[in-house]
Amino acid sequence: MTATYWISCDGIPPELVLLKHEDAKTLSIKRYGPDKNLFVGSIGIQIFENLDAISEDLVNIATYVYAADRLITRGTEKNIGPGWKRDLNFIIPVLEPRVWDNKKVNTLLKDTLSFLSDDFYNFHFIKREREEGESQVFAFGEEVFKHPDSVNLFSGGIDSLTGAINDIAISNKNPLLISHWPMPYTKTRQQRLIKSIRQKLPDYKTPHVQARIHLKNPPERQEYTQRSRSFLYLSLASAVARQLGINRVHVYENGVIALNLPIWKQSVGGMDTRTVHPKYIKLFESFYNEAFNADLKILNPFFLKTRAEVLEILKSAGYAELIEESHSCSRTRVSSKFAQHCGVCSQCIDRRVAVEAANLQRYEPKGTYENDVFIESLSGIESKKTWRKTKARAMAVGYVKSAVEIAKLSPEEFLSSYPEIYDATPYLGIPEEEAFSRIYDLQIRQSETVLKVFDSLVKKNVKKITRGAIPKDSLLGIVAAQGHLTEDIPLYVENIIRILTNSLPTIFQKEPPKNESVVQAAAEGLFKTTRVDLDREFPQLAFATRGFKADFTNKAHTVFIEFKYPHPPNRKVAQIIKEMNEKILLYTDNEAYALFVVYDHYKMISDRKTFCEDFEKYDRVFVRIIV
């Protein structure tokens, strides 16, 4: 079920929330006082006068949303769907409540954030007065510099680096680069890269703006997805642009990452990042222009390019060596001080493929990646404590498998397989039919690049592979043995669970199912809708001397799925456990995989973790509880 939170921001007593919502989960976010839990520092280069009131409100709203996003976790990745979403209700003091209470502005704000993070949002604004000497996000100063043409988001990754070079060196423009640094080493990396750019381009003197916004004394467990960081980032950039009288913000991101089609098709909601998705960019633009009565344009000039094509721009311009200082990892918090990149996340894998395709490996010295999924054992990586939950195998194999599948698709098949395209085509500023054609061409080029890179890597390392010097469960070992073309059972199981967890609780929200047959029928409908090809109660399966029918089985008859539904008065948990124990050995002794899906509508299982672990100690057995 979706968890509801009320977030009281500076000066709003949480008790006011509890008076109306006795069962509410509350969170207090404070920027001031001895118990503050959010730090907002001044921007590193002092170039701004006071922000206008509406801009200050926007930056504060974005800051509170970002802090709440970090502090309120979604739960584990086994809880995808309604349980993955959060119902976030903010009470925020603002200088200009008339602007934020405007129905259209408020609706656009909620729509923008809801699409970005796949959560529910509500905002309640209270009038506040600006206090004398109050700390501002933007510091004051009178530094003189050549007036910028645009404000560019600058994360320090390959795309934003190339965007900066594209504007400064190729187009002879003068962008102001703005960054957000939540951690000291992020600041250091960005500054190091800026220093390298200035050494190559000494005439570029426009200040680099760094905003420091982060949690103070954060809890050990934080929400890692950080979808709302993009809203904070764009809010900062828009406020800077407004102060300087600029109406253009550049967001340089290659189209493959911006669109971010799911590596596995059943990924849902907040599991797929939308931080620079065309629809999100247009939603933010519409929201901002309505609130400020402005004409801001947010542009992504790299949307129709792959990352390898972006690197070719940098290479052709003569600045390829700068990639050594760039940083692309999406798991910065868990990479070590010895390596800039984790090597496991999709961003790291895509970066490596692009660098290989552009033949720029010499600018990535040994140690750039903490884990080398290409030649290291993927199970070995997953066994390390820090990387245990990264799904290294699923991510790496899924990346290559997705390229194989997309490369074979006709335009019609591509659209059918990835209906997410419909979210992007209306927002590219060109006719939708042309937009689809260009996105299809982009994805085909990306797939062909990935496959060419792995063709080359396997050929280059064939001796090491055949002699066992490269583990068979490394990505190269798996690709060489065509393992990426076969069904990855753990990934297959998680896909099924995502589908069920996303929808079963919603189906039975008003009226619980009467029996297991009703649950099975609902599941069958979901499988058909999401194109999961399963057989329902396949005719009697013979194992040894016994025969029985599973609820569902895959076409290869290697995965058997059974639904269990404990419910009062007679279908008790003990009976469910007995039935599962009777089936487990029958499956495992015959080298089959078993997935038991327990729909616990009445929450009769008190210790879900132990319940699952008691069965999953057997090989090839998966147990998932959906509530």
Question: How would you name each of these model-derived features?
Answer:
Residues 492-537:
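Acidic-basic catalytic patches of nuclease active cores, encompassing PD-(D/E)XK
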Residues 552-554, 558-569:
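Conserved catalytic cores of phosphodiester-cleaving nucleases, focusing on short active-site segments
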Residues 1-152, 164-212:
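RNA-binding accessory domains that recognize and position tRNA/RNA substrates
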Residues 566-606, 614:
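Catalytic cores of nucleic-acid endonucleases
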Residues 601-627:
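Domain-level recognition of nuclease-like catalytic cores that cleave nucleotide substrates
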